[in-house]
Amino acid sequence: MAIVKCKPTSPGRRFVVKVVNEDLHKGAPYAPLLEAKAKNGGRNNNGRITTRHKGGGHKQKYRVIDFRRNKDGIAGVVERLEYDPNRTAHIALVKYLDGERRYILAPKGLKAEDRIQSGEDAPIKLGNALPLRNIPLGSTIHNVEMKPGKGGQIARSAGTSVQLLAKDGQYVTLRLRSGEMRKVHADCKATIGEVSNSEHSLRSLGKAGAKRWRGVRPTVRGAAMNPVDHPHGGGEGRSSGGRHPVTPWGVPTKGYKTRTNKRTTKMIVRDRRK
């Protein structure tokens, strides 16, 4: 994997920094594991914007990823590593001994022809998935389930990982990249290793148009809008907005807590903010 800084042959190329991985498959993805992906421009079923700064972008197909890793006891061989436009991590196409193929999140260091396995009896090896109770303390893991059988939800983006700190009865303690420490049921599965493409954070798109190709629209300051569009809008010339910073809907935006479901914090041992 190489970091390539483009020559400034044009204003749009001047600040471009690319992450080039020669190990990625250069052909088409595996068709049976593709699904159509419709764009909604950040609108809900009423046509109203629920997520700002979305719209346009290149057409994509969704790759069906096996987050559950429930192919227990059947070994698989990594056929190839692929780029996935829907996530920051790379994915691996695995062919199992029974003939089925599945996409999984590719851990850092996984290569074509590597053998992987899942289940309670799987060895502690890069890319293998097994219950947390069977993983040694101090291990680096990713794609961690929060409920047994639900599929991995923690540490799925590029370069992320979780460390297994302690085991106590039916629960284990994990340390997340954010600094948070939380408990998870010991029957939850996790995959050995760190997620691939850790250099993703080093890339620079170089121009606004590259964001538009990815379906990201501009972020406009409230003070630059009209009064009908934002509480900070309007005024003669440049203005401060005239009040403490708020969202377009009038909710305070600097340190104001909006979380309502406090019950889910019972599994958090240490908050990421402390």
UniProtKB/Swiss-Prot annotation:
Biological process, per Gene Ontology = cytoplasmic translation
UniProt feature, compositional bias: Basic residues: 50-59
Give the GO cellular component terms, alphabetically.
large ribosomal subunit
What InterPro entries does the record tag this protein with? NA-bd_OB-fold, Rib_uL2_dom2, Ribosomal_uL2, Ribosomal_uL2_bac/org-type, Ribosomal_uL2_C, Ribosomal_uL2_CS, Ribosomal_uL2_dom3, Ribosomal_uL2_RNA-bd_dom
Q: Which UniProt keywords apply?
A: Ribonucleoprotein, Ribosomal protein, RNA-binding, rRNA-binding
User: Mind telling me which SUPFAM superfamilies this protein's record contains?
Assistant: Nucleic acid-binding proteins, Translation proteins SH3-like domain
Which residue stretches belong to region Disordered?
37-59, 222-262
GO terms (molecular function) for this protein are: rRNA binding; structural constituent of ribosome; transferase activity
Q: Which SMART domains match?
A: Ribosomal_L2, Ribosomal_L2_C
Task: Give the family per the record.
Answer: Belongs to the universal ribosomal protein uL2 family.
Q: Note the subunit structure.
A: Part of the 50S ribosomal subunit. Forms a bridge to the 30S subunit in the 70S ribosome.
Listed name of the protein? Large ribosomal subunit protein uL2
